[in-house]
Amino acid sequence: MSASVAVVSGFLRIPSIQKSQNPSFLFSRPKKSLVRPISASSSELPENVRNFWKWLRDQGVVSGKSVAEPAVVPEGLGLVARRDIGRNEVVLEIPKRLWINPETVTASKIGPLCGGLKPWVSVALFLIREKYEEESSWRVYLDMLPQSTDSTVFWSEEELAELKGTQLLSTTLGVKEYVENEFLKLEQEILLPNKDLFSSRITLDDFIWAFGILKSRAFSRLRGQNLVLIPLADLINHNPAIKTEDYAYEIKGAGLFSRDLLFSLKSPVYVKAGEQVYIQYDLNKSNAELALDYGFVESNPKRNSYTLTIEIPESDPFFGDKLDIAESNKMGETGYFDIVDGQTLPAGMLQYLRLVALGGPDAFLLESIFNNTIWGHLELPVSRTNEELICRVVRDACKSALSGFDTTIEEDEKLLDKGKLEPRLEMALKIRIGEKRVLQQIDQIFKDRELELDILEYYQERRLKDLGLVGEQGDIIFWETK
């Protein structure tokens, strides 16, 4: 699902994003604007949105007392307060019968075919089938869904070319390849043998559309629900000014004597009547992940990150010993480390680098006698040779990655400052700038470390001090027998 570039010593790779890609909230492209929202009560609202609001009213989900309603906003569609909304006040509640999740698929006509499918694949297939069914009970909701988002999975080849050199590009291509492989499997196992159940020929483009919808709009991390579309709730947009994602939504019982479940969405902040209601999608996602999942990026430098992949080569003569040590410290054959703009190196990264680089005279630390202490020893420099190697490998990896870009940070910033850019080009520029800044930061960290190699204290010196064999000036103490 990802591509990587091997560099230098063979134990460090510059990969695509390796974090889990769980579907979470929904698509939006936040922009600050003073444009007046067009609300659901207005005749200016698109007909499909008015029909959607009426459908929700007919379902008993909304009424004249509802505190928020759909509206045309700078991001596209959003939820706007009909009256003042207090902090942590419930904005909407959607009953389970209006959710779309794997259970919905199981109860549908195609349910018997989907038992062996991945949950997201089965829901994607359900969405596509219902989209082509004119009499679908979900018709009004499906008519509300966009044909695409600004997620990089929908970008053209020309647009993707603007991401040349970035990890986001390799991740996007890897994700698209993964989705295509899942579609080909689905086509052979389900679609072709069961043409009678599908009124229209389902294509790869349909499948990518459904994937993008789920990636951008589905809620996850809920009680018993890891993949669920919630009509109306999925109009809520993201605001970077909101710094908490706690308690914005939950699944709860409908009442004391009811077995029904409700999806409850709360406003994390006070909202005035007529203003848009926002939440925080995910505080931990990088800009590359935001671009892939939702189709937007933030200006916050803490969203800029780069993933270094470090692996123990199978050709290493000490492969087994190193793997045992890594696994005993909750790591593995490959380590993924996210370096964030302006922040220190992640915990465990230097230790893992030193472990992977261990060899020659330093290999004695791999002996079983050190099993319980080696990770602690690796917190500090082992030897000049070991430390010099990891500095060289990381710096060469950064230079290799930077050479993959056609432009400098200054050139990208000049383009960005001109303004009036297409949203996707603007996003690509910000991603390029962010990744290059972090690469330069990593390179500088290890460049500074190279300058300290002569003054660092290494394992042997620390050991001699522990034994009382080194004086205050660093000279070795000898005793002569009398």
Curated annotation (Swiss-Prot):
Disulfide bonds: none annotated. Substrate binds at R217, R221, D234, Y249, Y281, Y294. Residues 1-57 form a transit peptide. It is found in: Plastid, Chloroplast stroma. Residues 59-282 form the SET domain. It comes from the Eukaryota. Keywords: Chloroplast, Methyltransferase, Plastid, S-adenosyl-L-methionine, Transferase, Transit peptide. It catalyses: [fructose-bisphosphate aldolase]-L-lysine + 3 S-adenosyl-L-methionine = [fructose-bisphosphate aldolase]-N(6),N(6),N(6)-trimethyl-L-lysine + 3 S-adenosyl-L-homocysteine + 3 H(+). S-adenosyl-L-methionine binds at E75, G76, L77, R217, N237, H238. One of its GO terms (molecular function) is [ribulose-bisphosphate carboxylase]-lysine N-methyltransferase activity. InterPro entries: Rubisco_LSMT_MeTrfase_plant, Rubisco_LSMT_subst-bd, Rubisco_LSMT_subst-bd_sf, SET_dom, SET_dom_sf, SET_RBCMT, SETD3_SETD6_MTase. Disruption phenotype: No visible phenotype. Its main location: plastid. Its EC number is 2.1.1.259. SUPFAM superfamilies: RuBisCo LSMT C-terminal, substrate-binding domain, SET domain. GO terms for biological process: peptidyl-lysine trimethylation. GO terms for cellular component: chloroplast; chloroplast stroma. It holds the Pfam family Rubis-subs-bind. Protein-lysine methyltransferase methylating chloroplastic fructose 1,6-bisphosphate aldolases. Can also use with low efficiency gamma-tocopherol methyltransferase as substrate, but not a cytosolic aldolase. Able to interact with unmethylated Rubisco, but unlike in pea, the complex is catalytically unproductive. Belongs to the class V-like SAM-binding methyltransferase superfamily. Plant protein-lysine LSMT methyltransferase family. This is [Fructose-bisphosphate aldolase]-lysine N-methyltransferase, chloroplastic. The lineage of its organism: Eukaryota, Viridiplantae, Streptophyta, Embryophyta, Tracheophyta.
